[in-house]
């Protein structure tokens, strides 16, 4: 049996391929930054569908025009953020996207996937 050593810095990489389950929502943050919120539904071969919230800072304007039903490749990292709402501390786990590409753009999707996999430590 072999063992794998994970680097101390760790790796936080999320790759999703799924369907945009609702139209994107573009919001302006108090900082002035814009965030595009996406809801991506992933349907594993043997299992129930899972809905994954995605936040994309600095998304290109064209992405706000995507519509529900579009198949997307999402590359990013998992983040759990905490906030106060209605006087209570709440949390939300989401994928913070670094790249989102419609899968119909096969060359761009392949490039994004290869780039993401290239960030993994060599010893994995």
Residue ranges and their predicted role:
Residues 1-124:
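Single-stranded nucleic acid-binding surfaces, predominantly the OB-fold ssDNA-binding core
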């Amino acid at each position: 049996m072999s063992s794998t050593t994970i680097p101390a810095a760790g790796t936080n990489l999320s790759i999703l391929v799924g369907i945009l389950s609702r139209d994107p929502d573009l919001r302006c943050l108090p900082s002035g930054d814009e965030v595009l919120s996406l809801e991506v539904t992933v349907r594993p071969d043997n299992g129930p569908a899972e809905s994954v919230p995605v936040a994309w800072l600095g998304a290109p304007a064209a992405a706000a025009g995507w519509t529900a039903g579009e198949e997307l490749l999402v590359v990013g990292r998992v983040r759990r953020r905490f906030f106060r709402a209605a006087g209570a501390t709440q949390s939300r786990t989401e994928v913070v996207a670094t790249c989102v590409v419609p899968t119909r753009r096969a060359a761009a999707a392949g490039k994004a996937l290869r780039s993401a996999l290239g960030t993994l430590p060599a010893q994995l």
